């Protein structure tokens, strides 16, 4: 494996140009400058992964064992993990199944609909009953 020097992410970030390109993958720092032109995905893929932890980018592709072996030759040191920002994931806030504040409003609206409907039904029933009894 390559050198044992420890770099900060700020130091690695200074190497993000086509003529000087370093990547952080799996806690190691790699100088991939000479490989930019030979990379099957093109130089832009590697350049877009500079100045950050590119481990997820690398693993998502599913590189071959020969690609991983090539990395050993490009290793220039380790990354100081305390300089890499922690990944935050979005966790939606927990909400009740119903909005407790709006439940009374829902009941009021339901009653505003049902009470006139019941009154109308009773009025029609009384009229129908009176019509039947008069015949």
Swiss-Prot record:
An annotated Gene Ontology molecular function: heme binding
Reported function: Membrane bound hemoprotein which function as an electron carrier for several membrane bound oxygenases.
Domain Cytochrome b5 heme-binding: 4-80
UniProt topology in membrane: Single-pass membrane protein
Places the protein is found: Endoplasmic reticulum membrane; Microsome membrane
PROSITE patterns xref list: CYTOCHROME_B5_1 (PS00191), CYTOCHROME_B5_2 (PS50255)
Keywords: Electron transport, Endoplasmic reticulum, Heme, Iron, Membrane, Metal-binding, Microsome, Transmembrane, Transmembrane helix, Transport
Pfam families from the UniProt entry: Cyt-b5
Segments traversing the membrane: 106-126
Protein family membership: Belongs to the cytochrome b5 family.
One term under GO cellular component: endoplasmic reticulum membrane
Top-level division of the source organism's lineage: Eukaryota
Residues annotated for heme binding in this entry: 39, 63
Organism field: Cuscuta reflexa (Southern Asian dodder)
InterPro entries cross-referenced by the UniProt entry: Cyt_B5-like_heme/steroid-bd (IPR001199), Cyt_B5-like_heme/steroid_sf (IPR036400), Cyt_B5_heme-BS (IPR018506), Cytochrome_b5 (IPR050668)
Protein name, as recorded: Cytochrome b5
């Amino acid at each position: 494996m390559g050198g044992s020097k420890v770099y900060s992410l700020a130091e690695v970030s200074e190497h993000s140009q086509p003529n000087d390109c370093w990547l952080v993958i799996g806690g190691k720092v790699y100088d991939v400058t000479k490989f930019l032109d030979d990379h099957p995905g093109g130089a832009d893929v590697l350049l877009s992964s500079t100045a950050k932890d590119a481990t997820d980018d690398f693993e998502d592709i599913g590189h071959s064992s020969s690609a991983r072996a090539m990395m050993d030759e490009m290793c220039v040191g380790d990354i100081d993990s305390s300089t890499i920002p922690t990944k935050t994931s979005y966790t939606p806030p927990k909400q009740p199944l119903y909005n407790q504040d709006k439940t009374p409003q829902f009941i009021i609206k339901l009653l505003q609909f049902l009470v006139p409907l019941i009154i109308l039904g009773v009025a029609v029933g009384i009229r129908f009953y009176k019509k039947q009894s008069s015949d």
